[in-house]
Amino acid sequence: MAEAPAKKLTVSATEVAVEIVNMNKWYGDFHVLRDINLKVMRGERIVIAGPSGSGKSTMIRCINRLEEHQKGKIVVDGTELTNDLKKIDEVRREVGMVFQHFNLFPHLTILENCTLAPIWVRKMPKKQAEEVAMHFLKRVKIPEQANKYPGQLSGGQQQRVAIARSLCMNPKIMLFDEPTSALDPEMIKEVLDTMVGLAEEGMTMLCVTHEMGFARQVANRVIFMDQGQIVEQNEPAAFFDNPQHERTKLFLSQILH
């Protein structure tokens, strides 16, 4: 993917979208996340990088309570995530998530996949939900696929449907968990281009990815994780050109060719 200077978009200096304070998570005796502290401002675009098993996907899954943290605090759009199911639902309504695997319903058409949540969760009338869905399918450049089923689409097209489906809920924050890692190389660019478009419109984004060209182009900040900890974070130019931590230097030397 061709690299370009990051566009100077408005990032709120005062409005916090996500705040994580001393967050820890265990799987049994395994300490998967250690004392995570992170503040994401409205409109900020953050790329989270790191080796497999570093905890990066687990961290963003905690942001919409797909994973439960055992210690510390997570506040999303002013709501603290606890065991309160009502608060969890409040957060999930405002946070879209796109996964490595598309998670589309195979027995529903593309249009039906996109209208399901707005109709059932937002209580949107069907006609309005279909209009919203077509708007976002046009935005990700696949409106002609609306009446097809997921199995009739390429992997790149299915991932763009997954992005459109999330946008139909009008989220304030988008989380991406390695959205291109399951795609064939020739399909990666079409998905990244869609994500670049979202970033250019000012969407608050946290993205776990190994696509470092995307990080250079889009991110306000790149975070490097290893062994369940945030090891280093900086603006893209400083992160890539002058990494401070030896573990970051080693990772970049292995991933950048």
Swiss-Prot record:
InterPro entries: AAA+_ATPase, ABC_ATPase_HisP-typ, ABC_transporter-like_ATP-bd, ABC_transporter-like_CS, MetN_ABC_transporter-like, P-loop_NTPase. It comes from the Bacteria. It holds the Pfam family ABC_tran. GO terms for molecular function: ABC-type amino acid transporter activity; ATP binding; ATP hydrolysis activity. Keywords: Amino-acid transport, ATP-binding, Nucleotide-binding, Transport. Residues 18-252 form the ABC transporter domain. ATP binds at G50, P51, S52, G53, S54, G55, K56, S57. Part of a binding-protein-dependent transport system for L-amino acids, affects the uptake as well as the efflux of these amino acids. Probably responsible for energy coupling to the transport system. Belongs to the ABC transporter superfamily. This is General L-amino acid transport ATP-binding protein AapP. The gene is aapP.
